Amino acid sequence: MNSPAPPLVVKVGGSLFDRVVPLLEIFREVGRPVLIVPGGGKFADLVRRLAVSDTAGHWMAIAGMEQFGWYIASHGVPAAFRLTLPSEVTVLLPYCALREIDPVPHSWNVTSDTIAAWVAKELSADLLLLKSVDGIHHHRRLLSRVEDPSLTPDEVDPAFIRFVFEHGLRARVVSGRHDDRVRRALRDEAVVGTLVDPRF
C-alpha cells in the first residue's frame, strides 16, 4: 500500500482569482494536505502604483495577500495564522507570521513567489507555484527544468530561483488554468511545467 503524500505548499497566484473554486475542488478531490499561500494579485498591483516607501509597500502587498487569503477561506477553507504543516486543504493568512519574523527583504524583487518558497523552507515541504502561464520560459522556450540559479525570468519574482537554489528546495511552476496539470502536479506525476530542483 502506498504511503500518503506529504503535505505540499501551493502558491495560488493572484491572477487565478477566477479559478479559486475549481482549484479548491481539485485539491479536495486529490486529497493531499495542502497549505495554500495566496498571491497578491490585484491588491499588490494597486500598491505598486502608489508612491510609498519600500517597507510600506512590502507590508501593504502582504496585506493584499491576506485579503486574497480571506477570499479563499470564504469558500470553506480553514485559515492558518502561523506556519504549520496542514492535515487538509488550508490557507495561510501570512501577515502576522511574517510580521513576527520579517524574514525577507522589503523589495519588489521579493513577492509572494519567494514568500511561498520561504514558507516551504520553514516547513521542509515541496512547493508548487500555480500561475496563469505554462511554466518558466527562456528565449521563448518552455524550460522543463531550471539549472541556472542566476536565471531571472519574467514568470517568477527576481529573487525566487536563487532562493530555491540557496535553500535546496524542490519547486514546480505549473499552469493553474489546466485542471489535469494541477491534478498531476499534486500527485507528483510528470506534467507540463517547470521544475526547479537543485538537489538532483
Question: In which residue ranges do the predicted regions lie?
Answer:
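C-terminal catalytic "cap/lid" subdomain
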Residues: 1-200
